[in-house]
């Protein structure tokens, strides 16, 4: 019966997009305020029916210092507790609830939509189509999801506390497929995870998928992973266990195998208008004058010549990923419908992939244009109308000043969450330089932002580490961008004799002297090198550094997210070099299959996993138990009088917390002077004063004092 209900939902979802009446209009030439000579026809045509039933070098001393010792009695299987039930909303109130939400946002939504498409004479028709289908998706949203929406509306700060712990993973690498993942939910709960980010799992062509970011069908799961029914069942089971699901939504482009792309390739003008097609290179050359390349070495250029159609198509990422034309309102509408469809399958957090790139304009760099913010603002309002329990996570891997605007304003918010990408990059910069000044500056900048802004904090993810640092600040110390990037990459790839890190470069561009970095946390901390050398002291110290970096990440303001495998110190996987589909992409170095054999060691204290996993478990529980880690609690840095030691303070009415982190290979003294009583180190249980704290090489303290 459950399966039949799910199938009925699928059928209803397909029909919702397909039933919009699309009377033929006369062809239209859209003017673009003379900023570019692109003509886009936007005849209102029948929407595509998408089938969903197919279904400076460093001397590394190896001074003997004990790794963290943590008492661990938690060896029993995790007890799965169901999330507390939310009172159901009477069905008769559904329409009034929807009308109230719509009325709250309608004027602004209309204004922004009509302003964005003011040159389109059919703008009113497109807007009405959008509003009509929004209501249909609301009607199809099941009661459990509506109840969750209602509960979260009553507590809009539900994601800003200290109770969310995230993990990101590839389904196939972790458990084979969606059903396999469902069978591993006990382990995920044992990792204290209640925010599960599943890397791209929608239909994409094998060998031309860009790790799943070349989507051929937004309403179909990759066949090797299962079906959309399997996904909906997984989200339902996760919700019963209090686990929120995050899923990537690739906005900038589709695969060349998408139905729209196929019809465009066959010469259908209305589908070519959903992308950027040109008969010759005249207009593309204007774009290329100011638009940087995303992948200058692996996929140079912003356009691809299609021999079969004798046209150029815009492909800013890979040649098989065709950029969508958001100047066409049909594109925006259809992509919003796809987002709402995924929300109705139980997605709690929608990750807006490559969102800064979605609006193109000649004479600009085609990044972070005002129209992008207009679209994200509209998406936020549409979610608040149809599915207000859903969060938007913006993937904005840009310079710091470009990231924050994607939060919008307090009155007109855009994304709920953003990646704390600059702090992540600054952390690894500190690992390589052993100088915390840049990291401290970055933390101070984040601390100065409104507390409504919530960042997603992380050490590693599926992607590379890009060196988007504050070079204006570094130049004050005579540090120049290009040679400094080279030093960072050389250190973290182990080119210096005494470097402990083992990483690989990604997209090395000799012309710019630029490259990005790949590798797992454990390999970058030295566990790989010292393990290979059978240097037990070195391994213990590397484990300590791994713990310290995670402790620092967990003590920041926001939501911590661990990359699957980091909890068991998984090392680089070099086997990708033997796979023709992966060999050219070094990011697969840290995308290897999850090592379940290593996970079995997590309760054996003599193993690497037994020394790491229990400490991370304790840190995560401490964070959830102490209100001082709430996202809305202010954070500030304090002087330690040592360039290698970082100290941060978080304080509310109940507690005062001081986190101290040693980024040096030497034992140090943190010359802090918080003369306000005795503190307890939450990690070891020791009591000490927050004055002249002795801290081991690559070690840390979590000092806490209760005020009441």
Regions found by a protein language model. Give the residues of each.
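Long, intrinsically disordered low-complexity tandem-repeat segments
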Residues: 14-82
């Amino acid at each position: 019966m459950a399966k039949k209900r799910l199938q009925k939902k699928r059928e209803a979802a397909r029909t919702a997009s397909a039933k919009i009446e699309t009377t033929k209009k006369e062809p239209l030439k859209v003017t673009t305020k003379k900023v570019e000579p692109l003509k886009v026809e936007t005849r209102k045509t029948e929407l595509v029916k998408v089938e969903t039933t197919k279904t400076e070098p460093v001397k590394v001393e190896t001074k003997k210092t004990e790794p963290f010792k943590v008492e661990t009695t938690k060896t029993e299987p995790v007890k799965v507790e169901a999330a507390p039930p939310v009172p159901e909303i009477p069905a008769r109130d559904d329409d009034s609830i929807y009308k109230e939400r719509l009325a709250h946002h309608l004027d602004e939504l209309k204004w922004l939509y009509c302003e964005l498409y003011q040159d389109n004479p059919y703008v009113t028709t497109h807007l009405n189509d959008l509003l009509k289908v929004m209501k249909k998706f609301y009607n199809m949203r099941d009661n459990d999801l509506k109840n969750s929406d209602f509960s979260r509306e009553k507590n809009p700060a539900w994601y800003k506390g200290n109770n969310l712990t995230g993990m990101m993973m590839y389904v196939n690498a972790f458990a084979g497929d969606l059903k396999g993942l469902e069978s591993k939910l006990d382990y995920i709960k044992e990792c204290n995870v209640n925010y599960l980010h599943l890397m791209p799992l929608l239909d994409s062509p094998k060998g031309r998928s860009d790790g799943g970011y070349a989507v051929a069908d937004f309403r179909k799961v990759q066949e090797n992973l299962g079906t959309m029914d399997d996904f909906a069942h997984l989200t339902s089971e996760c919700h019963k266990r209090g686990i929120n699901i995050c899923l990537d939504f690739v906005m900038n482009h589709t695969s060349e195998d998408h139905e729209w792309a196929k019809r465009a390739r066959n010469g259908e003008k209305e589908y070519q208008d959903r992308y950027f097609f040109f008969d010759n290179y005249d207009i593309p050359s204007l774009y290329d004058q100011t638009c940087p390349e995303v992948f200058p070495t692996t996929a140079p250029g912003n356009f691809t010549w299609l021999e079969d159609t004798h046209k150029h198509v815009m492909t800013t990422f890979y040649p098989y990923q065709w950029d969508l034309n958001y100047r066409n309102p049909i594109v925006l509408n259809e992509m919003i419908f796809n987002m709402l469809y995924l929300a109705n399958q139980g997605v709690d957090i929608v990750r807006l992939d490559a969102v800064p790139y979605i609006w193109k304009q000649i004479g600009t760099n085609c990044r972070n244009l005002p129209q992008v913010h207009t679209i994200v603002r509209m998406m936020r309002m549409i979610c608040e109308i149809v599915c207000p329990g859903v969060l938007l996570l913006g993937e904005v891997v840009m310079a710091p000043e470009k990231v924050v605007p994607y939060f919008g304003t307090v009155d007109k918010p855009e994304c709920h969450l953003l990646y704390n990408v600059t702090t992540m990059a600054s952390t690894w910069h500190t690992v390589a330089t052993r100088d915390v000044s840049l990291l401290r500056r970055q933390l101070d900048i984040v601390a100065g932002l409104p507390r409504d802004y919530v960042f997603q904090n992380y050490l590693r993810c599926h992607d590379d580490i890009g060196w988007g640092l504050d070079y204006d600040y570094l130049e004050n110390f005579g540090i120049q961008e290009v040679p400094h990037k080279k030093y960072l990459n050389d250190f973290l790839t182990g080119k210096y004799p005494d470097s402990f890190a083992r990483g690989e470069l990604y997209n090395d561009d000799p012309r710019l002297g630029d490259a990005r970095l790949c590798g797992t946390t454990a390999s970058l901390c030295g566990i790989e090198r010292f393990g290979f050398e059978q240097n037990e002291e070195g391994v213990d110290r590397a484990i300590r550094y791994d713990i310290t970096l995670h402790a620092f990440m967990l003590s920041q303001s926001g939501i911590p997210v661990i990359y699957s495998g980091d909890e068991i110190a998984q090392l680089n996987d070099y086997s990708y070099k033997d796979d023709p589909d992966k060999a050219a992409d070094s990011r697969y170095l840290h995308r290897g299959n999850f090592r379940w054999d290593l996970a079995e060691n997590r309760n054996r204290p003599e193993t690497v996993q037994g020394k790491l996993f229990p400490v991370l478990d304790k840190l995560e529980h401490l964070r959830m138990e102490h209100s001082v880690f709430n996202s809305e609690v202010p954070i500030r840095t304090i002087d330690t009088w040592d360039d290698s030691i970082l100290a941060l303070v978080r304080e509310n009415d109940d507690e005062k917390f001081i986190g101290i982190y040693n980024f040096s290979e030497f034992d140090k003294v943190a010359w802090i002077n918080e003369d306000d009583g005795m503190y307890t180190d939450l990690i070891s249980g020791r009591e000490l004063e927050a004055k002249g704290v002795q801290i081991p090489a690559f070690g840390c303290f979590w000092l806490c004092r209760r005020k009441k």
